[in-house]
Amino acid sequence: MGSTLRTVSDRTFTHGKGLLLVGLLWATIPGSLHAQMDPYFTAINYPVEKQSFMVMALSDLQVARYGNDFATGMFMVQYGVTPQWTVGVMAEGQKISGMPATYGGIRLNTYIHLFRDDRLLNLTLYGEYEDLNGAALYKMEVAGFGPEDLTEPLSLARETSVRTFEQRVIVYHDWGRLNATFNFIRETALQAPHGSDYGYALGFFFKPSWTGESMAGMADMAAPPALSMSRLGYGLEMIGALGDNERFGFYWNSQQHYVGPVFTYDFSSRWSVRLEPAVGLSDVSDPFVLRMGVAYMFGTHH
């Protein structure tokens, strides 16, 4: 049985390599590339503008499938080293109902946009080192099988080290104001038994008409009033798991999957807020997650 599973897995990954090659070939069509603010919570697309910082405070309120409801928080700082290369650091914590607030750990990430200009498929490679503990619950991604609610004692979870290396292949494209983004996610354990879990993030987003028009070459246009629909962006984000090395693919009710509308509001070119009410789609997903965030960008061009 084990050899059969490995054969199926090998065929799946061979097919996946073929799809990646097709994506690389499609990505050879050039255009113009602009740095913008990433609107999603889990899906990643745009690099941070060169010599600019993006600071984000993110919080999730989650109705737990198992155990007590909880709130999680993530503080993130990212820096654009070059127009194509971004580095960042993230720290997270959580508060489970009836338990004390707990530190979840730290993440270090970097991602490189492979081309200087815009392509049919803008291809980015992403890597993230995660030094977390067993109580870390923020949904930066979901992967593998089963739920992620805390079912063991908090004191034990806090002492359990969870170190992983996350990799993503990111593709996105803009058609005017519309952005489409897809992330293929792999999480590799840096501790025994060193297996890998897989997941995905998919998003479609209409950028605010004010910023969309500015990016299209109308940067001198007057800013809209503080309360204006032209400052509102909206879209849809879906995230989920794709199994592991032994069973890769959709096993729907054994994996977490979430979908929800995402909204952003740009108070200025520096400040933005975002909101996503997401619902769980499977038997092991949390029923509801309210995702919130505030972002601030500053640097040489802000």
Which residue ranges define each predicted feature?
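N-terminal secretory signal peptides that target proteins for export/translocation
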Residues: 1-15
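A ubiquitous, low-specificity "background" feature that marks scattered single residues
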Residues: 13, 21-23, 44, 243
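Bacterial N-terminal signal peptides
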Residues: 17-30
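Transmembrane beta-barrel domains of Gram-negative outer membranes and organellar outer membranes
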Residues: 35-302
